[in-house]
Regions:
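Long, leucine/valine-rich, helix-dominated scaffolding and oligomerization segments
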Residues: 2-207
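Intrinsically disordered, low-complexity regions
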Residues: 5-9, 17-19, 27, 31, ...
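Extended, domain-scale alpha-helical bundle/helix-rich regions
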Residues: 179-371, 376
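Short strand-loop-strand
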Residues: 313, 320-460, 468-483, 487-488, ...
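A short macromolecule-binding patch
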Residues: 490-495
């Protein structure tokens, strides 16, 4: 970090306008404009905020005034982005045109928000005074926080991080270090935590997210992590790369996230910063080992929505330095898959419905609509439309009704209910495959989803799980799957309660023992009601 002026490398426009077109460039003028935003129409509000930020970033104004204006706009931008998320999250991994435009709008809003704060960074840094460090420290922290939003959104959409985002974050942090401001406490009213914040903690939150293997997490889990990680950053230390406790390295002059230090080539081992997550890993271990009743008192700040399974994944991502067990081998060909427990159960059972597997099919019952008393008058006989219609003349066309047999209807319904997909094989290893979706991705697909896979139509179905999902620039959507078992026995499982009624039979899979890897027999069940 020998460059004394990293802030000069930030990507920002050169302001050249003297006034704003929509309001006076003052706190009073912008406050009135914000009060008039059509909050009930989020789309229009987002459009107006976008135009406002673009103009404001082209405005020539002192840093102190720009900071006041940005602080007025920041909560409005975060509010709009938060409420627009429902239009593109928890949908298909590959978004349709309209959701994609909404997601791009949110990214653009927070990108321009970050540009506004980076303009303040360059203004304050060029006239910095040690006796007044707060303005620059706040601008640095706000810049990182504004860039954190697009990073989280890219993770949730399993798409590449915007070009230059990592490098801009590194430059902002290097600016803080150059002025010795990385540990200065600043307040942030929009944070999830009341504790004082710092530039280093904001930077560490982004770096931790970058090496959390979010492509193996579901969208809601990533949102929960983004909310909690801000409070975890103080448990992580930035240090020199040559320290033995540095599990991850950051190439601070490259547009890249942190990586395990074992993944760096010799030619890349310069201008590095180390991450020591050991205190955080210890806190995670303590939390997971504590009784559920005592976890609220653990030193790990955790939101209620972050589950122990998700925390366990994070502990492995930040602490597991084991190399890949098997090498990936490029491959060609196709593979057939089905998604979800219901579909996997159906195909493993030889395309039988769950009721047939239980050997308890529903028995047909005949409805009897006869009157209780023979000879009793029909109460509907005097209805205005109860008389027979005799207006049809011979030779008039008649509508033909085509009936389908029940077997045909059931087969057609099952094809719609349990679709199969043919995917391209990118590479494989003994433990799994990398597959590519050539067409639309079903909305059901998420990391952790149970899969059935079939190499050829003559072979049986194997059981697998989707470990990660990513969107490749120009290459569509790819998915990494891990093989769980070469086969499984479909069955029904019932939760028997000592008091009260037992549960209904639910789908489950019996996994065979695999002696070659010393794995005992297993059982896959739905999460509810079969909890540990």
């Amino acid at each position: 970090m020998d460059n004394p002026s990293p802030y000069l490398q930030l990507r920002i426009p050169k302001p050249d306008k003297q006034a704003l077109s929509f309001c006076d460039a003052s706190v009073h003028g912008l406050t009135e404009w914000v009060a008039g935003l059509p909050k009930a129409n989020l789309g229009e509000t987002a459009r107006l905020l976008y135009q406002c930020l673009v103009e404001l970033n082209q405005l020539e104004t002192p840093a102190s005034n720009r900071m006041k204006l940005m602080e007025l706009l920041r909560p409005e931008v975060l509010f709009v982005c938060k409420h627009l998320e429902k239009h593109f999250l928890n949908q298909s991994v590959v978004l349709d045109e309209r959701p994609r435009k909404v997601a791009n709008l949110c990214q653009a809003l927070q990108n321009h928000l970050a540009i506004g704060y980076k303009l303040i960074v360059t203004q304050e840094a060029s006239q910095f005074r040690k006796e007044q460090p707060q303005p620059l420290a706040i601008a640095l922290q706000r810049s990182l926080h504004s860039m954190f939003g697009p990073l989280v959104r890219a993770c949730q959409l399993y798409c590449p991080v915007p070009d230059g985002l990592w490098l801009e974050m590194h430059l902002v942090y290097r600016t803080a270090v150059a002025f010795n401001l990385q540990h200065i406490a600043v307040t942030d009213p929009l944070s999830h935590y009341d504790a004082p914040h710092s530039v280093e903690n904001a930077y560490l939150a982004a770096m931790l997210l970058g090496c959390a293997r979010t492509n193996q997490m579901r969208q809601n889990a990533i949102a929960n992590l983004a909310e909690a990680i801000e409070g975890w950053a103080p448990l992580v230390h930035l240090q020199t790369a040559d320290s033995p406790a540095s599990l991850f390295w950051i190439a601070i002059r490259q547009d890249a996230p942190p990586r395990l230090k074992s993944l760096f080539k010799d030619s890349e081992k310069q201008y590095l910063l180390g991450i020591n997550p050991t205190p955080l890993l210890d806190a995670i271990e303590e939390y997971l080992q504590a009784d559920a009743s005592k976890r609220a008192f653990a030193r790990l700040p955790v939101t209620e929505r972050l589950t122990p399974e998700q925390i366990q994944h994070l502990g492995a991502a930040w602490g597991d330095t084991a190399e890949r067990t098997f090498r990936r081998i490029p491959a060609q060909g196709t593979m057939t898959i089905c998604l979800g427990m219901s579909a996997v159960h159906y195909f493993l059972a030889g395309e039988k419905d769950f009721g047939d597997v239980l050997k308890a099919p529903d028995e047909p019952r005949n409805a009897n609509f006869a009157s209780k008393k023979k000879g009793a008058p029909d109460i509907w006989a005097n209805s205005f439309d109860a008389q027979p219609v005799a207006r049809w003349e011979p030779g008039e066309p008649m509508e033909e009704i085509k009936y389908s047999s029940p077997e045909t209807l059931i087969a057609d319904n099952n094809l719609d209910k349990y679709p199969v997909y043919e995917l391209l094989i990118v590479n494989h290893s003994p433990s799994g495959y990398c597959l590519s979706w050539p067409r639309e991705v079903p909305s059901q697909l998420q990391a952790g989803e149970l899969l059935g896979i079939q190499d050829t139509a003559k072979q049986g179905w194997s059981v697998a799980v989707a470990r990660w999902i990513r969107q490749v620039r120009g290459g569509g959507t790819q998915m990494g799957i891990e093989l769980i078992a070469p086969s499984a026995q479909p069955c029904g499982l019932q939760l028997v309660r000592k008091a009260g009624e037992s549960s209904q039979y639910l789908r489950a899979l019996l996994l065979p023992e695999i002696e070659a890897i010393s794995r005992p027999p297993g059982l896959i069940t739905p999460r509810m009601p079969f909890q540990e």
